[in-house]
Amino acid sequence: MAEEVKFSPYEDAVAGIVIQILGRTGIAGEVTQVKVKILEGRDKGRVLTRNIKGPVRLGDIVMLRETEREARRISAR
């Protein structure tokens, strides 16, 4: 009975700060590719490349549900 109850799927999220904006991607440019520095947790200090949907600026704090996966670099065809 000492089981922890999760109220939100985002309870395990880890904070990261946007340190660089790499470009826009997606069919209509609706996704922004950014470099994020992890602020807490076991990957603290690690820099990841992530795709973020919606408005984002340098210095924004984003909550990442997981820190294992990285986005592929944007490439010109």
Swiss-Prot record:
Biological process annotations from GO: maturation of SSU-rRNA; ribosomal small subunit assembly; translation
Gene Ontology MF, one: structural constituent of ribosome
GO cellular component: cytosolic small ribosomal subunit
Top-level taxon: Archaea
Transmembrane segments: none
Entry keyword set: Ribonucleoprotein, Ribosomal protein
Pfam families (alphabetical): Ribosomal_S28e
PANTHER family, A to Z: 40S RIBOSOMAL PROTEIN S28, SMALL RIBOSOMAL SUBUNIT PROTEIN ES28
Family per similarity comment: Belongs to the eukaryotic ribosomal protein eS28 family.
Name of this protein: Small ribosomal subunit protein eS28
Species annotation: Pyrobaculum arsenaticum (strain DSM 13514 / JCM 11321 / PZ6)
